Amino acid sequence: QKIAKGQWKPIRDVNEIDPKDGYDVISTIDVYVQDIAHHALLESLQKNNAEHGCVVVMETKTGQIRAISNLGKDPKSGNYYETINYAVSESHEPGSTFKLVDLIALLDDNKVDTSKVYDSRGGVVTYRGKRVVDSHKGGYGKISLGQGFEKSSNTIMVQAVYENYNSNPQQFVDRINNMGLNKPLGLPFKGEGKPKIPQPSDASWSAISLPWMAFGYGVSVTPLQTLTLYNAIANNGEMVKPLFVSEIKEWNKTIKKYNKQVINPKICSISTVNKVKALLENVVKRGTGEKLYSKDFSMAGKTGTAQAN
């Protein structure tokens, strides 16, 4: 048989392997949800002139990823392109979204209840000369822990964590580790970002490590880890691993099926789950996420804002 560049090859070569059709990989992505998520992200990035961003939609019970979009801005053209998988690879300080960890720990360790009142102290509390400041100038006066979470008060959440864990910070860190935030999710592809959870035994641990962790600084997790944690609350405490592939087929015959993978069957008690769910709903109804509220949908969530300094 004559091949490229006028060369010949034997047609009965015993070493020749006949071509074979490859397998079909069936992803979990819903193209309609993906399209909506992608364009919503693009619109938000353009509106805020953001450098980059990501959005991920996870099915609560199964962990199947129904949409994932990552967009970064080209500094030359100003256009947005998908070049880096930020949702998977970017380990960063989560800011106020980490306050969910505070709440779970405080409630599950029976330290306080959501009705306990704290003083926001004019919106500023100080630890070893370092200030923790509320985004709302002047603070919120005296409010309950639950209200502090709904309003995303740094001073309230930090005081609650510091007051109850300063004598034994390892107990707080153990709670974080129990939620699986101290290790990667173990996704089946390269490039997953590594989380960073300070340990009291670390040489870098200081007097401000605990209060800074309480409002999401000094710690690093990926967006997908944050989503997996919040999904666990929606899933009544069961944490499931994100799935990107549902099955592998050959000629419409299923070769392998990927089922739900449980990371932690119970990250906290059902009592804590129910209290946290109610507060996450209130964040949208009357808290920092109220702009998203609609009577037409059941929603819960938590806002998070990072600061540069």
Regions found by a protein language model. Give the residues of each.
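Beta-lactam-recognizing serine transpeptidase/beta-lactamase-like catalytic domain environment
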Residues: 2-16, 20, 29, 53-91, ...
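Conserved beta-strand/loop elements of the cytosolic catalytic core of P-type E1-E2 ATPases, chiefly
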Residues: 23-33
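Flexible, solvent-exposed loop/hinge segments and secondary-structure transition points
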Residues: 44-51, 208
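Short regulatory alpha-helical segment in sensory/regulatory domains of signaling proteins that mediates
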Residues: 41, 45-46, 180
